[in-house]
């Protein structure tokens, strides 16, 4: 983590670049949460897969977007409006765009060292709020 250049302005990253990073962070945080329960690997994969997919991430995006700082709303909107060329068949185009927006927000929070904000979002997932 020490090799990441945090001095680059967050606006210099595209929405898709932020989503690329946010996707990895999202999955890592969800995996870390479920790992603590001592589940076997197939069970871990089942639980993680239920939370790391566009349909679910779209729901989380809708829950959090109105409560975010304006800076993160703008990042989410920019990512949502990115020129995404392919979409999975497991969700609608809008769900995929909203999931991309959530991932971009998570990626931006990570680069801005807003770990507590990421934890708040993860807690929504964990507590099912």
UniProtKB/Swiss-Prot annotation:
Keywords assigned: Endonuclease, Hydrolase, Nuclease
GO MF annotation terms: ribonuclease III activity
Keyword set includes Hydrolase: yes
Keyword Hydrolase recorded: yes
Pfam families assigned to the protein according to its UniProt record, in alphabetical order: Ribonuclease_3
Cited InterPro entries: Mini3_fam, RNase_III_dom, RNase_III_sf
Protein's GO biological process: RNA processing
Species in which this protein is naturally found: Fusobacterium nucleatum subsp. nucleatum (strain ATCC 25586 / DSM 15643 / BCRC 10681 / CIP 101130 / JCM 8532 / KCTC 2640 / LMG 13131 / VPI 4355)
Functional note: Might be a ribonuclease involved in RNA processing.
Enzyme active site: 23
Classification via Gene3D superfamilies: Ribonuclease III domain (1.10.1520.10)
Sequence similarity: Belongs to the MrnC RNase family.
Protein name from the UniProt record: Mini-ribonuclease 3-like protein
């Amino acid at each position: 983590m020490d090799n990441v250049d945090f001095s680059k302005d967050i606006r210099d990253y595209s929405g898709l670049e932020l989503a690329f990073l946010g996707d990895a962070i999202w999955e890592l945080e969800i995996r870390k949460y479920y790992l603590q329960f001592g589940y076997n690997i197939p069970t871990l994969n089942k639980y993680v897969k239920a939370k790391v997919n566009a349909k679910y991430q779209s729901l989380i995006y809708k829950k959090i977007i109105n409560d975010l700082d304006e800076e993160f709303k703008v990042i989410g909107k920019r990512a949502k409006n990115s020129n995404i060329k392919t979409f999975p068949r497991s969700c609608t185009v809008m769900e995929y765009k909203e999931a991309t927006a959530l991932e971009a927000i998570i990626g931006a929070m990570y680069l801005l060292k807003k770990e507590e904000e990421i934890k708040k979002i993860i807690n929504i997932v964990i507590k099912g709020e």
